[in-house]
Amino acid sequence: MAVPKKKKSKSKRNHRHAVWKGKAAIAAQKAISLGKSVLTGKAQGFVYPIEEEEEE
């Protein structure tokens, strides 16, 4: 005979949800910070190819 599984408590569900949301918030903050540094030209971790005009 089929027996229903034990139900997990709401506090465990809420804790998992909070951890997941926290990780997403940290990732979003890093992405915004990286975008700001690239836009202002202060990014240290990127190497951009410099396009030089050739004079003939």
UniProtKB/Swiss-Prot annotation:
Residues 1-20 have a biased composition (Basic residues). GO terms for cellular component: large ribosomal subunit. Disulfide bonds: none annotated. One of its GO terms (biological process) is translation. GO terms for molecular function: structural constituent of ribosome. Keywords: Ribonucleoprotein, Ribosomal protein. Residues 1-21 are annotated as: Disordered. InterPro entries: Ribosomal_bL32, Ribosomal_bL32_plant/cyanobact, Ribosomal_zn-bd. Belongs to the bacterial ribosomal protein bL32 family. This is Large ribosomal subunit protein bL32. It comes from Prochlorococcus marinus (strain MIT 9312).
